[in-house]
């Protein structure tokens, strides 16, 4: 098969060379509009090519670890190499990895390569570490007893992922601090450049200040997002979505519609009051999303007890009904009610696969969904469910440890963010007040010409910066914590309310403290001959 990596690299290099040559020609001939169009098109094409190339994983991730655990679990039963590949190929939740295994199966069945040769061919189209995994899996696929190979491979990859996750958490901690530092520095960049307008008489500096500050914040957020592990917490069954998720989807359009009255309030009463209205609107969907996420986290915390209990009981009886009745006596927290429903279903004759699938849908947990699927596949191939339960339970415990470490780091970033957000708003409000003061007092000095600060631009720029920092801060907190994307709406709502309150408080403080003094100073400077 053609090497996708080499093809993509060649396309990227070709686009870069052509765009540089065409851009130089247009620049020399003075066709600046054409230059902008060509660079925009080239940038879009490069972005799409990089996006396609990014789909080929180049580092260890959660899906790869789960894939190996899945193969190791079902290898405890009577299974052939063809079936090992088929199970992974049919599990579309593995994304790109599932596509590769589908290619292996297609080469082996339709073109007569055989599983081992097909695996070798497909390995050449991937990147490490997945490429290395496929090369080593050739030994497992050529063996009559692949369990030993897969045990070593899954345990090794789990340890590597553990090390990667620890390093990623340290990177999140460091980059979170750097992001917080730059968010405060960005405001001072704007303030210094705006004040320079008075002495340089170049109003265009104001635009440059907001451009630099916003660009720095966006770059820092992208850098943080690049190092964050892409864990999946939520699983949504399209046919049977959980009630908490349905509530969230119901109130989300209402919150989005409330941005219209928030804009009207901003026009009539002022921007800070519009922020308060918009923040209050986003609190409701954010609250439902946060409660939904906490429910899933609670389910995950009790799931290791459930899966180990099911494995212990079904290893001897092979009856899901008896296993669930036994596990119901254990302390399962938020899983208890879900398990009672599962027990009621299995009592009236619902089959095991349907029962556990419905349990996964109601739990809305990706961990529960994948572990239940592995458990069912292992059961269908006659695996030792006692061992399978231990494997899946231990993997869930490791995932919980990772989540708690990540949450501890995220809390530090969260505290810093909620502290810096109002400070940023206060400084921008002071900047607006000082700009108006300079315009009204310093421009009347006869022996020196002072520049006029464009206060209208500053007002719009401040609103833009507050909205940008609010959104980026909320997304940064979401990336640091992981979890459900809807929880970022709660952060947006809280930060908008905090920003509006800080703006109102800063305006009141400036008017109360310096309003009279600045008014008298303005009268004095106006009387200077």
Predicted feature residues:
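Juxtamembrane helix-loop transition segments at the membrane interface in multi-pass membrane proteins
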Residues: 48-62, 224-247, 293-304, 438-445, ...
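Hydrophobic alpha-helical transmembrane segments in multi-pass integral membrane proteins
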Residues: 261-263, 318, 501-512
């Amino acid at each position: 098969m053609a090497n996708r990596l080499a093809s993509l690299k060649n396309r990227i290099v070709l686009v870069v060379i052509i765009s540089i040559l065409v851009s130089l020609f247009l620049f020399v001939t003075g066709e600046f509009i054409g230059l902008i169009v060509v660079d925009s098109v080239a940038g879009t094409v490069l972005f799409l090519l990089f996006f396609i190339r990014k789909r080929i994983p180049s580092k260890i991730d959660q899906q790869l670890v789960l894939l190996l655990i899945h193969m190791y679990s079902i290898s405890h039963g009577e299974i052939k190499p063809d079936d090992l590949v088929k199970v992974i190929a049919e599990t579309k939740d593995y994304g790109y990895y599932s596509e590769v295994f589908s290619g292996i199966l297609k080469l082996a069945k339709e073109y007569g390569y055989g599983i081992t040769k097909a695996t070798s061919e497909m390995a050449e189209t991937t990147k490490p570490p997945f490429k290395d995994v496929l090369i080593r899996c050739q030994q497992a696929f050529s063996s009559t007893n692949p369990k030993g190979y897969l045990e070593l491979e899954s345990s090794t990859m789990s340890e590597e992922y553990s090390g990667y996750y620890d390093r990623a958490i340290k990177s999140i901690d460091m980059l979170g601090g750097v992001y917080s530092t730059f968010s405060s520095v960005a405001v001072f960049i704007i303030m210094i450049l705006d004040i320079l307008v008075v002495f340089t008489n170049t109003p265009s500096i104001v635009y440059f200040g907001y451009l630099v500050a916003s660009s720095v914040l966006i770059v820092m957020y992208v850098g943080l997002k690049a190092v964050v592990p892409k864990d999946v917490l939520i699983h949504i069954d399209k046919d049977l979505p959980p009630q908490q998720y349905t509530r969230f989807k119901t109130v989300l359009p209402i919150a989005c519609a409330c941005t219209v009255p928030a804009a009207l309030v901003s026009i009539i009463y002022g921007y800070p009051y519009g922020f308060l209205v918009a923040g209050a609107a986003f609190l409701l969907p954010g609250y439902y999303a946060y409660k939904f996420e906490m429910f899933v986290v609670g389910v995950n915390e009790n799931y290791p007890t459930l899966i180990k209990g099911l494995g212990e009981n079904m290893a001897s009886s092979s009856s899901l009904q008896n296993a669930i009745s036994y596990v119901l006596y254990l302390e399962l927290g938020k899983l208890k009610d879900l398990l009672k429903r599962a027990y009621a279903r299995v009592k009236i004759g619902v089959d095991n696969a349907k029962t556990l699938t419905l349990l996964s849908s109601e739990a809305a947990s990706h961990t529960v969904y994948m572990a239940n699927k592995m458990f069912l596949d292992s059961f269908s191939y006659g695996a030792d469910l006692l061992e399978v339960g231990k494997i899946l339970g231990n993997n869930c415990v490791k995932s919980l440890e990772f989540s708690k470490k990540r949450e501890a780091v995220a809390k530090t970033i969260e505290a810093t963010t909620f502290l810096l957000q109002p400070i940023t708003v206060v400084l921008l409000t002071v900047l607006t007040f000082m700009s108006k003061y300079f315009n009204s007092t310093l421009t009347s000095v006869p022996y020196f010409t002072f520049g006029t600060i464009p206060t209208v631009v500053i007002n719009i720029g401040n609103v833009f910066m507050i909205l940008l920092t609010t959104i980026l801060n909320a997304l940064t907190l979401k990336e640091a914590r992981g979890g459900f994307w809807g929880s970022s709406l709660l952060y947006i709502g809280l930060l908008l309310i905090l920003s509006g309150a800080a703006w109102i408080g800063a305006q009141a403080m400036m008017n109360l403290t310096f309003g009279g003094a600045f008014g008298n100073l303005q009268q004095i400077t106006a009387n200077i001959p």
